[in-house]
Regions:
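Flexible interhelical linker loops that connect adjacent transmembrane helices
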Residues: 2, 176-205, 247-262, 323, ...
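Transmembrane core module of solute transporters
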Residues: 9-58, 62, 142, 162, ...
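Interfacial helix-cap and linker-helix signal at transmembrane-aqueous boundaries
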Residues: 36-37, 68-69, 153-161, 215, ...
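Structural signature of transmembrane alpha-helices in multi-pass secondary transporters
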Residues: 22, 51-54, 58, 85, ...
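Hydrophobic transmembrane architecture of multi-pass small-molecule transporters
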Residues: 176, 376-378, 382, 394, ...
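Residue-level signature of the transmembrane alpha-helical cores
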Residues: 18, 80-84, 88, 104, ...
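C-terminal membrane-cytosol helix-exit motif in multi-pass small-molecule transporters
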Residues: 172-189, 207-216, 235-248, 480-488
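Helix-loop-helix hairpins in multi-pass membrane proteins, especially solute transporters
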Residues: 62-200, 226, 309, 351, ...
């Protein structure tokens, strides 16, 4: 597969389109929720399931998706996944009830679960050590580009059409991606099909689903909530049982020796840290732009473009920097830069305006771009061609659950500090819960009681909470520096068959 010449880069273009389709869907739903609540008559619980149904199926489906790609062919699985994603997007767009929409979103999550691990599995199979970081940078950069483009395109569509149009945007992207994958992507799969590990499939899916649900619920209902604790404990028990099963079964779904790889472990952990810090930016900053600066959703998307600009610059030079300085140093510098940017963002006040936000988000994007290709290459480069699907799915699963933890924990920090600083004096008791619910709820209450002083309290409380979230995210960036320096091997661009796993192994090999 690696001997395809220029055709491989056309294949990367196909993978870029597929990853952008999933990326659009991540950011675009939140824009449509108010209109959907009114049109479908959805209550708050149903609105939460609009989001949760996708996330749970996505978490449960990734490892089975990796196995299917390894067994039946990654190109075949990706084509089927694109069809599922396109049809379920149509079903979402034309849903006539909350139940229908939740079901369609669950199927959409299945499509996403099939797409992402398959894309990641194809990169180490298609590219050698020299070119793989460039391909990873292209796919990762495109996926990140979808985050600001989602609100921009979604905001435009909602201003001119009905809410279903934000899901129809997936359809042409999927069609073009399908044609491109069909034309340019080579087929690849394991040389020998392993027997189905049904026990491993069931335990991994159950564990990831229960743990993810517990984390999501914990962010809303609290970490001492009985259902939260029960879900998280059940998930952890299932995952421990999964590991024990994999150790004893003759044909395990996941080769646990993968976790002896310093490259895979460090790359996966650093990817999880990245997902944590991204929440600090991508969840909080659109709220800041809309609630504090008064932009609409489309305007908040435009204000994320400095971050994307920095990201694209970082991705472009990341491979050269890693070659010149070594991956330990280049990744350490990238995490130090994004951490410093987050600390700078933590100095924001109500009167800061767009200039400060543009400066620190651009610096954050640059740091992110410097680390993403090398970190992903560390994990994906440790995979053999035969097990690339399952290995990529394990990497994606850990990063997804880690990102969910980041969203829940940082979201809890944001909410608790916002509520703790809010001055509710003079606010009617009946309106206090709505004011504490979110910055948007607080501003709505301030308008309803015609209180400019309470509006000021809402804004100040939110910005103070935002600063704390960004500072915590900054410390996570410093954690990334520590992991890179201590754990990341000096060389990550060598295949597992050719390179020792770590400095300790290198000494032994000598």
């Amino acid at each position: 597969v690696k001997e395809l010449g220029a055709r491989r880069w056309w294949a990367v273009a196909a993978l870029v389109l597929a990853s952008m389709a999933v990326g659009f869907d991540v950011t675009i739903l939140s824009l449509a929720l108010p209109a959907m609540a009114e049109d479908l008559g959805a209550n708050n619980a149903e609105l939460q399931w609009f989001v949760t149904s996708y996330t749970l199926v996505f978490a449960a489906g990734m490892i089975p998706a990796g196995m299917l790609g390894d067994r039946f062919g990654r190109k075949k699985v990706l084509l089927v996944a694109l069809v599922i994603f396109g049809i379920s997007s149509l079903a979402c767009a034309y849903a006539t009830s909350s139940g229908v929409f939740i079901g369609a979103r669950a199927v959409l999550g299945l499509g996403g679960a099939l797409i992402m691990p398959t894309i990641l599995a194809l990169l180490p199979v298609m590219f050698d050590d020299e070119e793989r970081p460039k391909a990873i940078g292209a796919v990762a950069g495109a996926a990140m580009l979808a985050y600001p483009l989602g609100p921009i395109l979604g905001g435009y569509l909602l201003n001119h059409f009905w809410w279903g149009s934000v899901f129809l945007i997936n359809v042409p992207v999927v069609i073009v991606a399908y044609l491109a994958v069909s034309a340019w992507l080579p087929e690849s799969k394991a040389k020998e099909a392993k027997p189905f590990d049904l026990g491993g499939l069931l335990l991994s899916s159950l564990g990831l689903t229960a743990l993810t649900y517990g984390v999501i619920r914990g962010g809303d209902a609290g970490w001492t909530d009985a259902t939260t604790l029960a879900s998280m404990v059940a998930g952890l028990v299932a995952l421990v049982a999964f590991v024990m099963w994999e150790k004893r079964t003759l044909d395990p779904l996941v080769d646990l020796s993968l976790f002896k790889s310093a490259r895979f472990n460090s790359g996966t952990m650093l990817g999880t840290v990245i997902n944590f810090t991204m929440f600090g930016v991508l969840f909080t900053m659109p709220q800041y732009y809309q609630a504090i600066l008064g932009t609409d959703a489309m305007g908040s998307g435009f204000r994320l473009l400095p971050m994307v600009g920095g990201l694209l610059v970082g991705v472009t030079v990341a491979n050269k920097v890693a070659k010149a300085l070594g991956p330990k140093t280049s990744v350490g510098i990238g995490f130090a830069l994004l951490g410093a940017a987050l600390f700078y963002g933590g100095t924001t006040d109500v009167g800061s305006g767009t200039g400060l936000a543009a400066a620190w988000t651009a610096a954050y994007g640059l740091g992110l771009g410097l680390v993403l290709p090398t970190v992903m290459d560390a994990a994906l480069g440790a995979l053999s061609d035969d097990s690339a699907g399952v290995g990529a799915a394990v990497n994606q699963s850990i990063r997804t659950v880690g990102g969910s933890f980041g969203a829940a924990i940082l979201g809890s920090i944001l909410n608790s500090n916002y509520r703790g600083d809010l001055d509710l004096g003079g606010v009617p008791a009946a309106a206090q819960e709505a004011a504490k619910d979110s910055v948007f709820g607080g501003l709505a209450v301030a308008r309803s009681i015609s209180s400019s002083s309470f509006a000021d309290s809402v804004r100040n409380s939110f910005v103070s909470a935002l600063d704390i979230v960004l500072v915590v995210s900054g410390f996570l960036g410093l954690l990334g520096v520590l992991i890179a320096v201590v754990w990341l091997p000096r060389e990550v661009g060598q295949s597992t068959a050719k390179a020792p796993e770590s400095e300790h192994d290198a000494a032994d090999a000598a």
